Design a protein with these regions (language model features):
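Glycine-rich phosphate-binding loop of actin/hexokinase-like ATP-binding domains
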Residues: 124-183, 270-275, 279, 284
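ATP-dependent carbohydrate kinase catalytic cores
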Residues: 93-124, 217-224, 228
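Active-site nucleophile and cofactor-binding loops and adjacent substrate-binding regions
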Residues: 31, 74-75, 94-101, 120-122, ...
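A glycine- and small-aliphatic-rich helix-loop capping segment at beta-alpha/alpha-beta transitions
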Residues: 19-22, 75-78, 109-117, 145-151, ...
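Gly/Ser/Thr-rich active-site cleft segment
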Residues: 56-63, 69-70, 74-77, 148-150, ...
């Protein structure tokens, strides 16, 4: 059997596969409850009495991979790939960036698992694609000629052109607290949603989660404004990265935040913001924006990679 894992900064999701086409025993563990990736994997394997049955693994991590070392950006854990292989997965181990893991699932998705955002003049082609997913952080992976490219594009600074009106108030507050300019990941993430709400509501002690804030837009004016600003900023971010990648094959969005944030009522304004360019509007109009509606894209990508073990 092969262990499949999608390890973020907040949650680690596990399952196993016997045939590389289906998975079972899915489980989510909180990263904060363990001191290492080895402990997380071992805890899952023991829970399902799989320790002696699993000797291979495919693991996606919310971290850059620099040679043998993996250090998470938004969680206090790190590990050696070779060390993890020697300890638990001696017959084979693949470790990739978590968005790269998810990107391996894109080619196999059914139309029923996708929702097109607004009306574009194009349909997905064989051109470059990108997959973007806001979560604890902000991930982006490229897909070029079926090759997956991991990036850390969430750490780009936000251009001053985009920081105006209420966004300037929020940016100034962030700079005051953090003593640095905000990156897209600072704002287009769960922590960003909560920060927006705290600044707008002037309620530093709020216990609302990012999901509750985005879902309460009809009941709370500050929730509504938070959603409006995040929608705008995400669409403008996608405009920049789509132009950099020349992603005529489509911009794919995945994860619980975007599926809560981008509802049909904002499809058209989201598309209009994405297409807002004085020089490249025709190209942007031809790029499909596609929402991935499934919640197991990490496992689906891991299944594809498991075929290589």
């Amino acid at each position: 059997m092969i262990l499949l894992a999608d390890i973020g900064a907040t949650n680690a999701r596990f399952c196993v596969t016997s045939d590389c086409y289906n998975y079972e025993h899915s489980e989510s563990l909180e990263v904060i409850d363990s001191s290492s990736v080895e402990e997380l994997c071992d805890k899952y394997l023991k829970r399902y009495e799989l320790t002696n049955r699993v000797s291979k693994a495919v693991i996606g991590v919310a971290a850059p991979i620099i040679k043998d070392e993996v250090s998470f950006v938004n969680a206090n854990i790190s590990f050696s790939i070779e060390g993890l292989k020697n300890q638990l997965f001696q017959e084979g181990l693949i470790v990739v960036n978590d968005l790269a893991l998810q990107a391996h699932a894109i080619k196999g998705l059914e139309k029923s698992e996708l929702s097109f955002i607004g009306i574009s003049k194009g349909q997905p082609e064989e051109g470059p694609k990108i997959l973007v997913s806001p979560g604890t952080g902000l991930g982006l992976a490229g897909i070029v000629d079926q090759q997956i490219v991991a990036t850390e594009a969430g750490h780009l600074n936000i251009p001053q052109k985009e920081i105006k009106n209420d966004l300037k108030k929020i940016s100034d507050s962030f700079i005051s607290k953090s003593k640095r300019a905000p990156t897209y990941e600072d704002f287009l993430s769960g922590k960003g949603v909560r920060f927006f709400y705290k600044v707008l509501s002037e309620d530093e002690g709020t216990n609302l989660s990012s999901k509750e804030i985005l879902e309460n837009k009809d009941l709370n004016e500050d929730c509504s404004k938070t959603k409006e600003l995040i929608v705008y900023l995400l669409a403008s971010y996608l405009r920049y990265v789509a132009l950099v990648w020349g992603s005529t094959g489509g911009v794919y969005l995945a994860g619980s935040i975007v599926n809560t944030l981008i509802t049909e009522e904002v499809y058209q304004t989201f598309r209009e913001t994405f297409e807002s360019s004085e020089t490249m509007q025709d190209l942007l109009k031809a790029i499909p924006l596609i929402l991935v509606t499934i919640d197991d894209i990490g496992f689906r990508g891991a299944l594809e990679l498991s075929k290589k073990l």
